[in-house]
């Protein structure tokens, strides 16, 4: 009898981790929980990565951090927040207990799909099978939690006009993540993008990610479900107009998807008073904006923390925390109900390309990475990569090889300005190197395979 009771309790405990919690949905430009409009009152929640190793993932939702999650969830809930944003996780770890801790405090998790190793590089952008596989792993791990509120397919990938072409890869990542969720028959989880507040490309970026490109390239389901802006324009006791909030709201007033501040909280004036909260949740902004996420929970070297976490784990609330709590407690934004809401707005036209400020076409997006296609492409090649060269070595050899014979690189080459992407641009760097080496060798003879030992002939 005792054994049965223990077993029953274990089953109840396990099922509690996945107890029903109303997921968020989108209609038009608003988030909803059940029939009631949902305004984001969020906090960025991510400890710093190792200062000496930026590829290290410190996963705040992993089971090893369960005690921290439980305490932090209560502190964040007491603040008045209903969302945390997490920038990187290790999908191979267990997250049940931490997700339950936040669910128990009615807190949703908005999660970046990328990590320091798999994010889209703004200067040398790719969207390949390794990256897509990593995104899929995060989706697989977190789709089962009903308090997984949304996924970000990228964060500040574009930060000036010169790297605007990288946004094509973001749109491809959005498309493939959404289609993967659909193909696996998971519940619909919104996939969007968090952008830097960069004046020179701000309007083009928003239009490009949300425009209906089907009529241009027949690429369906690639529109971003929402847009976030990392915006620090309001500092101290600013106001709606001086801060730039009025101008940003006007720029986005006709968009048809939810838009929110994916980061806010300027610290040029300290302690932070968060008077912008009154504007964000006021009638001036709520027709366009769905709230915002304050940067950030724990105090780090950049001095944005709401909570000081000591070396012994003690949590000490800062003046910033108390100021934000008072501001959030004082707001009462108008609520829209889903059943009676008739969305308005206009889906933007895809922005026209130009060589100076927006060198990216919407006529085509990068191909969907496909492991089978890539594996088959490198089978039985006469010349292929020798082992696993480093990323820098691959870039060096491909740069030289493609310079001497661009035809050998046609199937692995991309041109976002022209909207052209080779069939194997979604393959890994090593696979692309093998494909190019083999094509070059076919035209220039077996002696051209080596490239200093990077390539090798196969018997």
From Swiss-Prot:
Its main location: endoplasmic reticulum. It is an enzyme of class 2 (transferase). (1,3-beta-D-glucosyl)n 1 binds at residues 87, 155, 295. The active site is at 156 (proton donor), 263 (nucleophile). It holds the Pfam family X8. It comes from the Eukaryota. InterPro entries: Glucanosyltransferase (IPR004886), Glycoside_hydrolase_SF (IPR017853), X8 (IPR012946). Disulfide bonds join 69-98, 211-350, 235-266, 374-427, 383-449, 402-409. Coiled coil: none annotated. The keyword GTP-binding does not apply. GO terms for molecular function: 1,3-beta-glucanosyltransferase activity. It is found in: Endoplasmic reticulum lumen; Secreted. GO terms for cellular component: cell periphery; cell septum edging; cell tip; endoplasmic reticulum lumen; external side of plasma membrane; extracellular region; fungal-type cell wall; primary cell septum. Glycans are attached at residues 34, 68, 90, 104, 146, 160, 212, 218, 254, 284, 308, 334, 344, 354, 370, 423. Keywords: Cell wall biogenesis/degradation, Disulfide bond, Endoplasmic reticulum, Glycoprotein, Secreted, Signal, Transferase. (1,3-beta-D-glucosyl)n 2 binds at residues 156, 197, 202. One of its GO terms (biological process) is (1->3)-beta-D-glucan metabolic process. The keyword Cell wall biogenesis/degradation applies. Its EC number is 2.4.1.-. Splits internally a 1,3-beta-glucan molecule and transfers the newly generated reducing end (the donor) to the non-reducing end of another 1,3-beta-glucan molecule (the acceptor) forming a 1,3-beta linkage, resulting in the elongation of 1,3-beta-glucan chains in the cell wall. This is 1,3-beta-glucanosyltransferase gas2. The gene is gas2.
């Amino acid at each position: 009898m005792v054994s049965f009771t223990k077993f029953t309790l274990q089953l109840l405990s396990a099922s509690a981790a996945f107890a029903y919690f109303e997921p968020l949905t989108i209609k038009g430009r608003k988030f909803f929980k059940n029939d009631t409009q949902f305004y984001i009152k969020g906090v960025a929640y991510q400890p710093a990565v190792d200062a000496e190793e930026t590829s290290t993932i410190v996963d705040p939702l992993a089971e090893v951090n369960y005690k921290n999650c439980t305490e932090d969830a209560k502190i964040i809930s007491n603040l008045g927040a209903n969302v945390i944003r997490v920038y990187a996780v290790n999908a191979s770890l267990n997250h049940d207990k931490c997700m339950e801790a936040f669910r128990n405090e009615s807190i949703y998790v908005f999660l970046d799909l990328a990590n320091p190793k798999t994010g889209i590089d703004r200067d040398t952008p790719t969207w390949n099978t390794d990256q897509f596989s990593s995104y899929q792993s995060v989706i697989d791990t977190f789709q089962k939690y009903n308090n997984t509120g949304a996924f970000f397919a990228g964060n500040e990938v574009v930060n000036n006009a010169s790297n605007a072409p990288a946004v094509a890869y973001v749109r491809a990542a959005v498309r493939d993540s959404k289609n993967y969720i659909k193909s696996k028959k998971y519940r619909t989880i919104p996939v969007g993008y968090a952008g830097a507040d960069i004046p020179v490309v701000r309007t083009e970026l928003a239009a490009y990610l949300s425009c209906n490109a089907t009529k241009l390239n027949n690429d369906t389901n690639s529109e971003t479900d929402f847009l976030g802006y990392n915006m620090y324009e309001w500092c101290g006791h600013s106001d709606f107009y001086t801060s730039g909030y009025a101008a940003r709201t006007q720029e986005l007033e006709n968009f048809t998807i939810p838009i929110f501040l994916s980061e806010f909280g300027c610290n040029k004036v300290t302690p932070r008073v968060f008077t912008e909260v009154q504007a964000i949740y006021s009638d001036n902004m709520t027709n366009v904006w769905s709230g915002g996420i304050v940067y950030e929970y724990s105090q780090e070297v950049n001095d944005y923390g709401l909570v000081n976490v000591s070396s012994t784990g003690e949590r000490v609330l800062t003046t910033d925390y108390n100021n934000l709590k008072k501001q959030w407690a004082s707001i009462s934004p108008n609520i829209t109900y889903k059943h009676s809401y008739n969305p308005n707005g206009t889906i933007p036209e895809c922005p026209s390309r130009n060589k100076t400020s927006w060198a990216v076409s919407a006529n085509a997006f990068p191909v969907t990475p496909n492991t089978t296609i890539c594996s088959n492409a490198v089978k039985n090649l006469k010349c292929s990569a020798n082992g696993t060269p480093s990323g820098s070595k691959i870039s060096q050899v491909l740069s030289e090889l493609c310079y001497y014979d661009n035809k050998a690189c046609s199937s692995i080459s991309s041109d976002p300005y022209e909207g052209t992407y080779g069939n194997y641009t979604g393959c890994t760097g090593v696979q692309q190197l093998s494909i190019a080496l083999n094509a070059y060798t076919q035209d220039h003879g077996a002696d051209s395979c080596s490239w200093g030992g990077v390539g090798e002939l196969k018997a």
